[in-house]
Structures are given as structure tokens and as C-alpha cells.
């Protein structure tokens, strides 16, 4: 499955992009929203990943943690498929507890915009996140060499319900492999949100080519 990343100023604009999109799931980046009337998203809830990314891991703006937690709580009243929260954030535990109460899936994420650590460190990160028992673990460092992709893709040998790939131009190949190995992967609906991100259409075409072989 492919999750299209929705970057919009409000829910109505997000809905318009979802209606035009051809993804299986849609990650709605509430950290980009300028207003928070979320009701228009309700009809699409079972296909939504709600993300309120903190600035330190690629968020569009700096939002106080208490405000982020309240936004997560409001968003979870929609009953989305998943919420995505960073493992290193102060509110991760509380978001996960609230999600379990509401029977909303949790993606626990880790992003590194500087590089890719050694495989042993990646395994420590994976094991630490898995110990928190999320529904999906997401690990996304940045590739500074082609070998960084190999380090990250090796994680699939040690975990299920894992989404792992590299950002950056050198990480594009790992994004393609993640579409084959992960429960879902991410692609842009329009302009790339993260370095090296493919569009939904581009990723679908590559997957068709691989399937044809």
C-alpha cells in the first residue's frame, strides 16, 4: 500500500487533495494546518494517518507539546486508521495511551535528517521502539551513501509491521524496496515533503514494472 502525504492549510483543502489522489492511505500533516476544524476529514477516517510532526523531526512549525497533545486528542475523535507520533517526543506515551483507549492504531516514528547510524545502533533504536508496543514502527534516517540503504533494509529481517527507508537522493532505492517489504510506504501527492520522496504515480509505475518482470 502507498500512503500519500497530504500537505494542506485546512481540512477542506486536505479533502480536495484526497478526492483527487490515487493512494491507498493518506497521511494528513496537521502541523501544516492553519485552522483545525477537522470534521470534513471524518468520511475518510479509515484511510487516514494523522501526523502532527514536531519541528525537530521535520515539522512545518514549532508547536508546544501540550498543544500538540491536545491536537492529537481532537484528531483521534475522528477514529483515523493511525496516528503517528515520534518516539523521542515528550508526549509519545500519552498519545499511545489515548490511542489505545480509542482503538486507533499507532505509528511510532524516528527520523534522522543528518545521516544513518551503524546497523547495531539502528537495531537498538528498533528494539527500544518495539518495546513500547506500537502497531507500526517507522525508522527513517538519511542516506549519505548507497550502503546506508542496505543497513536500513536489513532491519526488515528482524521485525514485522516495520516501515523503514532512507531519505535523500541516495535513499530513493530504499523507498522502492520499502513498498515491497513494509505494510505501506510513503509518497507525495504533489511536491515532495521529504528529501528524495517519490510521487504516488512514480512509485506505482515502478512497482508495475517490477511486477511485470
From Swiss-Prot:
- Cite a single GO BP annotation: chorismate biosynthetic process
KW Lyase (keyword) present: yes
* Catalyzed reactions per annotation: 3-dehydroquinate = 3-dehydroshikimate + H2O
Q: Which UniProt keywords apply?
A: Amino-acid biosynthesis, Aromatic amino acid biosynthesis, Lyase, Schiff base
What pathway does the UniProt record associate with this protein? Metabolic intermediate biosynthesis; chorismate biosynthesis; chorismate from D-erythrose 4-phosphate and phosphoenolpyruvate: step 3/7
Q: Which InterPro entries match?
A: Aldolase_TIM, DHquinase_I, Type-I_3-dehydroquinase
HAMAP family (UniProt xref): AroD (MF_00214)
What this chain does, per the entry, is described as: Involved in the third step of the chorismate pathway, which leads to the biosynthesis of aromatic amino acids. Catalyzes the cis-dehydration of 3-dehydroquinate (DHQ) and introduces the first double bond of the aromatic ring to yield 3-dehydroshikimate.
Name the PANTHER family for this protein: 3-DEHYDROQUINATE DEHYDRATASE
Q: How does it assemble?
A: Homodimer.
User: What's the protein here called?
Assistant: 3-dehydroquinate dehydratase
Q: What is the originating organism of this protein?
A: Thermococcus gammatolerans (strain DSM 15229 / JCM 11827 / EJ3)
Amino acid at each position: 500500500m502507498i500512503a500519500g502525504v497530504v500537505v494542506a492549510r485546512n481540512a477542506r483543502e486536505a479533502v480536495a487533495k484526497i478526492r483527487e489522489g490515487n493512494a491507498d492511505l493518506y497521511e494528513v500533516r496537521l502541523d501544516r494546518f492553519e485552522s483545525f476544524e477537522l470534521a470534513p476529514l471524518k468520511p475518510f477516517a479509515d484511510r487516514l494517518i494523522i501526523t502532527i510532526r514536531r519541528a525537530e523531526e521535520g515539522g512545518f512549525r514549532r508547536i508546544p507539546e501540550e498543544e500538540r497533545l491536545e491536537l492529537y486528542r481532537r484528531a483521534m475523535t475522528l477514529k483515523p486508521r493511525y496516528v503517528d507520533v515520534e518516539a523521542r517526543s515528550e508526549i509519545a506515551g500519552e498519545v499511545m495511551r489515548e490511542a489505545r483507549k480509542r482503538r486507533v492504531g499507532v505509528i511510532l516514528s524516528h527520523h534522522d535528517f543528518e545521516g544513518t547510524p551503524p546497523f547495531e545502533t539502528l537495531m537498538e533504536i528498533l528494539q527500544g521502539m518495539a518495546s513500547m508496543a506500537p502497531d507500526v514502527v517507522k525508522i527513517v534516517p538519511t542516506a549519505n551513501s548507497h550502503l546506508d540503504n542496505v543497513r536500513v533494509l536489513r532491519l526488515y529481517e528482524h521485525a514485522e509491521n516495520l516501515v523503514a527507508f532512507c531519505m535523500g537522493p541516495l535513499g530513493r532505492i530504499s523507498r522502492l524496496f520499502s513498498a515491497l517489504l513494509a505494510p505501506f510506504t510513503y509518497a507525495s501527492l504533489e511536491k515532495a515533503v521529504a528529501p528524495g520522496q517519490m510521487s504516488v504515480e512514480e512509485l506505482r509505475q515502478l512497482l508495475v514494472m517490477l511486477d511485470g518482470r
